[in-house]
């Protein structure tokens, strides 16, 4: 008797969503800076009225423990500590009557503050 192993490939869902709108805005900001090596780093840190808050910065360096997602030629970086809080989140950019800003829709957040800049899990 011989056992035949069946090679089944399943498509894993992305750990987070980086929208076209967010990628386009990041590309625009990188072009303004004139440094094509920049990547958007999204992170979670302690603070805010709900316990944690989101942060955004540009970075030229990809660390060994970073998770990287590339969309429309733009790279998004999330460090290992922040990753656990952002799994399943959508990183978007909104420009509406309330203003223009990057927005994170996070299914892991059990509550958030009124301004939406901090959350708890």
UniProtKB/Swiss-Prot annotation:
Iron-sulfur cluster binds at residues 49, 113, 115. SUPFAM superfamilies: HesB-like domain. It comes from the Bacteria. GO terms for biological process: iron-sulfur cluster assembly. Its cofactor is iron-sulfur cluster. The keyword Iron-sulfur applies. Binds 1 iron-sulfur cluster per subunit. Belongs to the HesB/IscA family. Homodimer. This is Putative iron-sulfur cluster insertion protein ErpA 1.
